[in-house]
Amino acid sequence: MKPRKNHQSISNDDFLIIRLIPNIFTTVGMCIGLTGIRFALESDWKSAVVCVLIAAFFDLVDGLTARMLKATSKIGAELDSLSDAVSFGVTPTVILYLWIVSITQAHNTYMLGWYWIPFIFYSSCCVLRLARFNTTNREASKQDEPKVVSYFVGVPSPAGAILLLTPIILEVNMLRFGHSTTGMIQPFYVCLWVMAVSVLMVSRIPTISLKSIKYKISYRKVIFVLISVILSAAVIIREQWLSLSLAIFIYIISIPIFALYVKRIK
C-alpha cells in the first residue's frame, strides 16, 4: 500500500505544477511588461514597445494554456486581470508619456501636467474595462445561451496598449526609411489619440476576437495556406515594424466593419 501512496503523492505534485503553468506565464508577462518602463527611462523606445508586445503574447498564451490543461481557476483570473492592468494600463502610459517629453523637449511643468491628464484617463479606462470584462465573464458562465458569434465588447486591453503606442511605432518606421520626424509629431494630437483609444476600450462596440475567426480549410488549399504563412513570416522577419504598422491599420479598419457585421447577424 505504501508504494501506491508515494506514487499518488507524486502524481498530485505533478498535477499541481501543471496547473501553475498558466499563472507562471501570466507573471512572466507582467515582469516583461514592467521591463518596458525601464527601457523607456533609458529612451530605448523600440525595446519598450517590444516588451509590451511580448506581454501581449504571454497574455494570449496563458489563457490558451489554462484551457488546454484545464487549469482555469479564480486566482488565475484575478492574477490575469492585475497583470493586464500593469502591462497594458500602466506600462504603455509611462512609455508614451516619457516619449512625448523626449520629442518635445518640454520642461514646462504646466504643459506637462496637461499632457499627463489623457494618460490618467487611459489607465482608468483600462482598469474599468478589465473590471467589466471580469463581471460579464462571471455572468456569462452562469448562462447557457450560445452566442451567435464570439467578440469582445470594446477594444481589449492588449490591443488598446498596442494602439496607444502607435505614434512611437510610426516614428520608428519613418526613421527606418530616412524621414525626419522633427516638428511633425505634436503632443496635442497624441493626447487626442490617447483619449480616442481610451474611449474605444470602455465602449460597447463589438470588436473581433480570435474565437470568432472560424474558417474551414479544404485539403486542396492546405499547400496554398502553408505557402502564404511562410511568405508572411518572411516579410515579418524582414520588416517587423512595417508589418506591425500594417497589422494595426488592418485592426483599426476591422473595428467598424466587424461592428456592422455583428449588428447584421443579431
Task: Give the label of every model feature segment.
Residues 50-96, 131-138:
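Acidic (Asp/Glu-rich) catalytic motifs at the cytosolic membrane interface
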Residues 25, 48-55, 118-121, 125, ...:
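Hydrophobic alpha-helical transmembrane segments of polytopic
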Residues 21-35, 87-94, 158-159, 163:
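The first (N-terminal) embedded transmembrane alpha-helix
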Residues 1-60, 244-247, 251, 258:
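Topogenic membrane-insertion module of multi-pass membrane proteins
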Residues 35-50, 93-119, 167-189, 237-241:
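Helix-coil boundary and interhelical linker segments in multi-pass alpha-helical membrane proteins
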Residues 61-68, 128, 256-266:
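Juxtamembrane membrane-interface segments at transmembrane alpha-helix termini
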Residues 1-13, 142-144, 148-266:
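C-terminal membrane-associated helical module and adjoining short loops/tails
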Residues 14-25, 32-37, 41-46, 50, ...:
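"…together with the soluble PPM/PP2C metallo-phosphatase catalytic core" -> "…together
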